[in-house]
């Protein structure tokens, strides 16, 4: 039975490989439904990784000072 950590890592890897982020005005890019503005590279991946405390696995993510969505306190 796979552990929660390995399942979370697989989900993050799947998201990183399957989600194509959109930059405004760029030709031939798919846009996710309901998306109005482009987000920074990997921001959805970083947000999830920081929430799951796996940000250290992604060197481009900066989890310092991210707000905890549930308690609205600063994450440590």
From Swiss-Prot:
Q: Does the keyword Protein biosynthesis apply?
A: no
Which keywords are on file for this protein? Acetylcholine receptor inhibiting toxin, Amidation, Disulfide bond, Ion channel impairing toxin, Neurotoxin, Postsynaptic neurotoxin, Potassium channel impairing toxin, Secreted, Signal, Toxin, Voltage-gated potassium channel impairing toxin
- What are its GO cellular component terms? extracellular region; host cell postsynaptic membrane
List the residue ranges forming a coiled coil, or say none: none
Query: May I ask which residue range the UniProt record assigns to the signal sequence?
Result: 1-27
Q: Which compartment or compartments is the protein found in?
A: Secreted
Q: Which residues carry this modification: Aspartic acid 1-amide?
A: 64
- Give disulfide pairs as residue numbers: 46-61, 50-63
> What tissues is it present in?
Expressed by the venom duct.
> What's a Gene Ontology MF term here?
acetylcholine receptor inhibitor activity
Q: Which residues form the propeptide?
A: 28-39, 65-76
Instruction: Tell me, in a sentence or two, what this protein's role is.
Output: Highly inhibits both nicotinic acetylcholine receptors (neuronal (alpha-3/beta-4) and muscular (alpha-1/beta-1/epsilon/delta) subtypes) and the voltage-gated potassium channel Kv1.6/KCNA6 subtype.
Family, similarity comment:
Belongs to the conotoxin J superfamily.
Q: What is known of its domains?
A: The cysteine framework is XIV (C-C-C-C).
Question: What is the name attached to this protein's record?
Answer: Alpha/kappa-conotoxin-like pl14.3
Which organism is this entry from?
A: Conus planorbis
For this protein's source organism, the top of the classification is:
Eukaryota, Metazoa, Spiralia, Lophotrochozoa, Mollusca
